[in-house]
Amino acid sequence: YLNQYFRESYLWSSLHHWNSSYNLLNPKRYKKGFHFVLTAQHVADRGMASTYLVSKGEETRQGIVVYSSPADDIAVLFIQEKFRNIEPIKYRPMKSILEVGEPIAYSGYPSSHKLMSIRGRVAGYEDKHGSGQQIILHTYGWFGCSGSVIFNKNGEVVGVLWGVDAEYYPSLAIVEDMIWVVPITKLDIKKPIKTICK
């Protein structure tokens, strides 16, 4: 049930020659009827107030960047004209970092594939310069999954997927079952909402 619920909110955008993944969310307790897209900053990196086209099926809408953090790799886009056939997920962020061994689920557009739903577990944590503690998942990911929102078993937002692990010795190799996620605790949702309400 949760996988289907999540899939309905996933959007797609073709950026940087790869698919990119987005989630349509609605923080109802902050502003009724306000819809935004949560993604990775590196797939929406043209700066504040820049615009991107995001799609689901035959519907396409324009998203405006209202929050951008290169250090944490999180971006928030404001959707001015609502989608007609997509119901946004209620934004329920975790208040703490998910523990090792806990299950997760997400959907995304790896490589040139259509929407895929993937499960996994928290494997551990690493530090990222400028951002601090990151979540490492034991799951599957590939280029194009960047920006996917990770959910726990209760449907709460865990964080945003921003990278696939890599091995540099003795040669470069992508480790597609070790995935980097920035915890949602890094995002203060009041900041993008304040930008919109100015």
Go through each PLM region and give its residues.
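Catalytic histidine site
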Residues: 1-51
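Active-site region of chymotrypsin-like
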Residues: 1-17, 80-88, 114-197
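Conserved active-site neighborhood of the chymotrypsin/trypsin-like protease fold
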Residues: 32-107, 112-115, 131-134, 191-197
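Short amphipathic beta-strand and strand-loop transition segments with alternating hydrophobic
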Residues: 24-28, 64-66, 126
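Conserved beta-strand and immediately adjacent loop positions that scaffold enzyme active sites
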Residues: 21-22, 28, 51, 73-75, ...
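Short, solvent-exposed loop/turn motifs
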Residues: 20, 59-60, 157
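Short, conserved secondary-structure segments in the cores of folded domains
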Residues: 22, 92-96, 140, 146
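A glycine-centered beta-loop-beta connector
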Residues: 28-35, 101, 150-157
